[in-house]
Curated annotation (Swiss-Prot):
Organism: Cupriavidus pinatubonensis (strain JMP 134 / LMG 1197)
Highest rank taxon of the organism: Bacteria
A Gene Ontology term for the protein's cellular component: ribosome
Protein name: Large ribosomal subunit protein bL21
Gene Ontology annotations of biological process type: translation
Quaternary structure annotation from Swiss-Prot or TrEMBL: Part of the 50S ribosomal subunit. Contacts protein L20.
Name of the gene this protein is made from: rplU
Family: Belongs to the bacterial ribosomal protein bL21 family.
One function term, GO molecular function aspect: structural constituent of ribosome
Keywords attached to this entry: Ribonucleoprotein, Ribosomal protein, RNA-binding, rRNA-binding
Function of the molecule: This protein binds to 23S rRNA in the presence of protein L20.
Amino acid sequence: MYAVVKTGGKQYKVAAGEKLKVEQIPADIGAEITLDQVLAVGAGDQIKFGTPLVSGASVKATVISQGRHDKVKIFKMRRRKHYQKRQGHRQNYTELRIEAINA
């Protein structure tokens, strides 16, 4: 069984037992969270789509870790104008382990 969930403005296809890195969720390590925004649920060749959400469906997950992605380097430059700008960015993430899908 799998589900498509929406969290942090993005959509993820998840199944029980998988690990997943999502946008940062303010929760302690080891805390159990519920993802309520389930867009689709599937098992085998049967799929149930929501309009926009599947009613009564939820995904239970456990927070494994909180961390930061690798640095992304941004470099802007205007030719012949002696303008250069360097910037870096590290996005925070939360790593989840999917425990169960309730449909």
